[in-house]
C-alpha cells in the first residue's frame, strides 16, 4: 500500500544484479480505505493510502459543480482512517464559496479557497502551509483541479491536467494511478485518480455519524436505541429537519439527513449477513 513503512534486508543500493526483499510491514498509524457499495462485492474494502496525516478534499465551486454528498463520504472516510480532513475549494472566481463554507466550517472542518489568476493560484500559499511537514492525500472527482494544485505545490510532479466536458459536466481522468511526491516544504503529497464515487460501506454504522458532527449533536436527543434509519418513529433528526423556520434551511437540513442515511443504509446492508 502506498505510504507503508517496511523493513528490508539484503543489498538496498539499487545496483544491477543486487537482491533485497521486504520482510515486514510496520504498524500503520492511519489507513484510508475505500469500499464497494454495489453488486456482489458490496462492503469489500480496498486500502488506498497508509500512514497519511491529511485527507485533502479538493472540490470545485463550479465547472464541475460541487457535490456535498461526495464531501460527506470523504469526511466519513477520513475520520474512520484516523486522518484530519482539509477541504480545499477551487475555482472560487467562478462561484461564491459562502454556501459550502457555511455547511462545513461549523463542523470543525478547515476550509481553504483558491482562485486561478494570471500570475498563478491565489490562496496556494495557505494551502502550502497547511500541507508542510505532513503526509497529505489529495482526493476529489475528475476535473476539480487536483493535478493543478499538485503542480503548484510540487512543480517537479508535472501532473497532466484536463478539462471538464461541457456536455456531461464531468472531468476527464488525467491521473490513473497514485503518485507520491516529496513536498519541498517537508512531508509528502500523494495524488489520487479522480473518481465519481467513494464507497464507505466498510465504516461501521455507529461510526458513520462521526462524519456528520451537526447530526451527531442532534442525535443525542433521540430515544435510546434509535437507529436513525428512515421511518423510525421519534428520530430527532427528522424533527430537526422539519422544524426549520426558513424553506432554504429546511432544504439544507433535509439534504444533510438524507446524505447521512444513504451512507448509513449502505453500511447496514454491507454488514448484514443475510444480504451477502
Q: What is each residue range found by the language model?
A:
Residues 70-73, 126, 259:
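Well-ordered alpha-helical segments embedded in enzymatic catalytic cores
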Residues 84, 91-144:
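Canonical P-loop GTPase G-domain recognition
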Residues 44-54, 58-112:
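Phosphate-binding glycine-rich loops and their immediate beta-loop-alpha structural context
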Residues 116, 135-143, 147-151, 179-180, ...:
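Conserved active-site beta-strand-loop modules that form the wall/rim of enzyme catalytic pockets
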Residues 146-162:
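A conserved segment at the C-terminal end of the G1
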Residues 2, 10-13, 18, 24-48, ...:
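Helix-rich effector regions associated with P-loop NTPase G domains
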Amino acid at each position: 500500500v502506498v505510504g507503508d513503512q517496511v523493513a528490508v534486508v539484503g543489498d538496498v543500493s539499487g545496483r544491477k544484479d543486487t537482491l533485497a526483499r521486504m520482510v515486514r510491514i510496520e504498524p500503520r498509524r492511519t489507513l484510508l480505505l475505500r469500499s464497494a457499495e454495489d453488486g456482489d462485492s458490496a462492503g469489500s474494502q480496498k486500502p488506498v493510502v497508509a500512514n497519511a496525516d491529511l485527507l485533502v478534499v479538493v472540490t470545485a465551486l463550479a465547472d464541475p459543480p460541487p457535490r456535498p454528498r461526495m464531501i460527506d463520504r470523504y469526511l466519513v472516510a477520513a475520520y474512520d482512517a484516523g486522518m484530519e480532513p482539509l477541504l480545499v475549494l477551487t475555482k472560487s472566481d467562478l462561484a461564491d464559496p459562502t454556501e459550502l463554507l457555511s455547511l462545513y466550517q461549523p463542523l470543525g472542518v478547515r476550509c481553504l479557497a483558491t482562485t486561478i489568476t494570471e500570475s498563478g493560484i491565489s490562496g496556494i500559499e495557505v494551502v502550502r502551509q497547511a500541507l508542510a511537514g505532513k503526509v497529505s492525500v489529495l482526493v476529489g472527482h475528475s476535473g476539480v483541479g487536483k493535478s493543478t494544485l499538485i503542480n503548484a505545490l510540487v512543480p517537479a510532479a508535472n501532473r497532466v491536467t484536463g478539462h471538464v466536458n461541457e456536455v456531461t459536466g464531468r472531468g476527464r481522468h488525467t491521473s490513473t494511478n497514485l503518485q507520491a511526491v516529496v513536498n519541498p516544504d517537508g512531508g509528502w503529497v500523494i495524488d489520487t485518480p479522480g473518481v465519481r464515487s467513494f464507497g464507505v460501506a466498510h465504516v461501521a454504522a455507529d461510526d458513520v455519524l462521526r462524519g456528520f458532527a451537526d447530526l451527531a449533536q442532534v442525535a443525542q436527543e433521540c430515544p435510546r436505541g434509535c437507529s436513525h434509519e428512515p421511518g423510525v418513529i421519534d428520530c430527532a433528526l427528522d424533527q430537526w429537519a422539519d422544524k426549520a423556520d426558513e424553506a432554504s434551511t429546511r432544504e439544507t437540513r433535509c439534504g444533510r439527513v438524507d446524505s447521512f442515511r444513504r451512507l448509513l443504509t449502505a453500511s447496514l446492508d454491507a454488514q448484514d449477513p443475510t444480504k451477502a
